[in-house]
Amino acid sequence: LTYVVKSECVDCKHTTCVKVCPVDCFYEGENTLVIDPDVCIDCAICEPECPVNAIVSDRKLKPEDHHWLDFNKEMSKVWPNIRKVKDPMPGYEDVNYTPDEAWEKVSRIPFKDIT
């Protein structure tokens, strides 16, 4: 069992979830975060920290959102681990994607933090 970052995180990346994770299971992409399901201990501490409700238990995933679980697993193997809170992405206040739009916008390229 694990928690999953879904579409609501795309182009937001608040990172408040990162500071409370006891096992450092968050990984950072260019425009979203993911959780490594092999590291997540299902503690649920991160879920209420997300101001856009992008984090959910895999047990509560809707059928149409199950691809996010696979995405989290895949990208957590190639993106860098994030342990420090950062500012949200510029313009996050205006992000209002449908789940399909978010899926199209999510970057799958390896992320290089230049800050």
How would you label these PLM feature ranges?
Residues 1-2, 45-115:
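Flanking helices and flexible, charged tails adjoining ferredoxin-like Fe-S electron-transfer domains
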